[in-house]
């Protein structure tokens, strides 16, 4: 079974693994006060406690110029199970769970092939949310087992298996979000997302709050007095925004504004901005970058009778299912 190197933690200071305190030292690191060199491995296959996580497989801690790096060496199928419980509701349809299992497995192999120095994936939502043992729900175990080894391929290689919570009715293409076209990641209409809590959302900001959020980006506008949505992408997402403030004006793209305000606050770039008495109201739909499979859209398809193969074919046209061992 393929193994993955999952970055669990990076810290400038001490970290705790299995009840042992590991501390950076001048010549490497120390465990419980004893020098052990630049690399230390936990004994056994776990589960090991690493900060808030309990993980299977091996754990290694390496001294880096910035402190300590904790990496979990875990089997691909165990990794898939541990992500599913963090990505989907446990009571969702079995076919949705299986579609997500294939995507989690495919994304992991895609990232592994990129050859990052020291690890394959991060454990947070910049890659996939990895829950360790706590993510291993019964539904996750079943979906992993029933799709064991299956991945999506395009021209014989694992695809960029992108997904998001909900699309707001239409997915985005890879070209409009990441600036490069991907044949199997085009925009498509999505039905059945009405049950998503993010079908319609709104959030308020004062002009002062907006101005402060932009300061780290180098846009020192003071109190924001006007927000103008400029260009939109083909799927309707905000591409550019102009902001006027008491200390100047600035322009940035919609994704940068979303990140500055919090990607779980402004849940997507499919929004419009309205003025209010004390500032601005962002009114939008969907949650996430919008590329690839909508999880809520997949769940709607499953409830209507689609199996996981049909779900994946709908969201990733031109790809094929195969077993990783066959590659």
Protein language model annotation of sequence segments:
Residues 1-327:
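Conserved, single-site charged/polar hotspot
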């Amino acid at each position: 079974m393929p193994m993955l190197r999952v970055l669990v933690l990076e810290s400038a200071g001490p970290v705790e693994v299995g009840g042992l305190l590991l501390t950076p030292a001048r010549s490497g690191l120390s465990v419980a006060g004893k020098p052990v060199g630049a690399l230390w491995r936990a004994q056994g296959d776990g589960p090991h406690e690493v900060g808030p996580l309990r993980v299977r497989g091996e754990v290694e801690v390496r001294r880096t110029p910035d402190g300590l790096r904790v990496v979990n060496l875990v089997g691909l199928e165990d990794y898939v199970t541990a992500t599913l419980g963090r990505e989907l509701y446990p009571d969702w349809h079995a076919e949705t769970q299986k579609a997500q299992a294939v995507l989690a497995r495919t994304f992991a192999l895609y990232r592994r092939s990129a050859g990052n120095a020291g690890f394959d994936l991060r454990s947070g939502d910049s890659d996939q949310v990895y829950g360790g043992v706590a993510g291993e729900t019964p539904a996750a175990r079943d979906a992993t087992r029933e799709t064991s080894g299956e991945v999506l391929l395009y021209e014989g290689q694992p695809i960029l298996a992108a997904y998001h919570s909900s699309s707001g009715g239409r997915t985005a293409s890879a070209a409009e979000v990441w600036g490069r076209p991907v044949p199997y990641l085009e925009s498509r209409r999505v039905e059945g997302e009405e049950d998503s809590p993010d079908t319609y959302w709104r959030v308020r900001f004062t002009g002062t709050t907006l101005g402060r959020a932009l300061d780290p980006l180098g846009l020192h506008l003071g109190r924001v007095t006007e927000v103008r949505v400029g260009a939109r992408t083909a799927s309707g997402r905000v591409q550019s925004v102009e902001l006027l403030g008491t200390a100047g004006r600035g322009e940035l793209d919609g994704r940068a504004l979303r990140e500055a305000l919090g990607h779980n606050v402004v849940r997507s770039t499919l929004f419009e901005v309205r003025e209010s008495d004390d500032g601005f109201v962002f009114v939008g739909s969907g949650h996430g970058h919008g590329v690839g499979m909508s999880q809520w859209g997949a769940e709607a398809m499953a409830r209507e009778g689609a199996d996981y193969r049909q779900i994946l074919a709908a969201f990733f046209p031109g790809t094929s299912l195969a077993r990783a061992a066959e590659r």
